[in-house]
Every structure is written in C-alpha cells, then in structure tokens.
Amino acid sequence: MAEPPGDPKAVKQDDNGKYLDAKGAPTFSVKPDGTVDWYTYSGFRRYHSECHVCHGPDGEGSTYAPALKDSVKQMNYAEFYGIVVGGKQDLGSGETKVMPALGDNKNVMCYIDDIYVYLRARSDDAIGRGRPAKHEDKPPQATAAEQACLGDKS
C-alpha cells in the first residue's frame, strides 16, 4: 500500500487555479461560508455522472463497491489515479469485486483531479452530502484544459 495522502489543507494554488496540499497533490478549498472551489464542484458533478452508479451517491459506497470517501483516507493521489486508470480486482471472502479500467474514458480522465478532490473533501467532512450550494466561478484555465483534453477545437 502506498503512503496515505496526508493533510488535505490547501497550501497553494497552481496556475490553473487548482489547490494543492503540502505534498503537491490536488486538494479542495472550502471557504467559511461554504463556497467550494470550482474543481471540487466539478468533481461532484463528474463523480455523480460516472462513479456513483457503483460507488453510491456522495461516495458513500454500495453493496458491491466500496465507499470512496473512506478509501481516499488511506489512498494517495498516485494510488487513486493508478486504480482508476488500470482497474482493480479484489478476490476475497468468496467474492470477486472488479473495478473496471477507466483510462480510456475521457469523461473520467479529463476530470480525474476534480473527482479526487471532491472525494477528499467528502472524506474530510469538509462538505456534506448533496450538491454544494455555492461554488467559485469556473476558471478560464479549466475551460481550456477541458477543451484540450476532450478534443474540442472551439
């Protein structure tokens, strides 16, 4: 098992407006009034578009897939990324649980940081269940990165 993620506190913002922790991993920012950063909000949207069918609403888990809000407490960004890209198979207690490889799914991979920071915010209880009520505006850099990743020429 890889090194745990460490303190999720944001210590800096990169050129794309993403928040990073002391180890340089993507993390969330929640203001005292509950306003979340754009990427955490985007992660909520992307998680509920691509991940919640198996892993349950709000990262809470289901009968056949773990609660990711709990998993990311023990999983650093590199480990999370590797599992999402390559998949994972658990053989234990008479059950086979399979996480499919999603490395070719642009609807996941173009937003992998966003999904991770959303789950980190949920795991730290920085945000509750449901859609965040307030969020920062979408940075222009997020739009440019999205268009480049998805192949949109507009």
What are these regions (language model features)?
Residues 47-57, 80, 84, 99, ...:
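The canonical Cys-X-X-Cys-His
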Residues 47-50, 106, 145:
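Secretory pathway export signals and precursors
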Residues 41-52, 61, 74-81, 132-134:
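Sequence context surrounding c-type heme c attachment/ligation sites in exported
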Residues 3-9, 62-69, 87-115, 119-140:
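Axial heme c-ligation environment in periplasmic c-type cytochrome domains
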Residues 57-60, 130, 154:
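Secreted/processed peptides and extracellular or luminal domains of membrane proteins
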Residues 36, 40, 44, 73, ...:
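Solvent-exposed, acidic/flexible segments
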Residues 6-46, 153:
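Electrostatic cytochrome c docking/interface patches
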Residues 136-154:
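Short, low-complexity, Pro/Ser/Thr/Gly-rich segments in the mature regions of secreted, periplasmic
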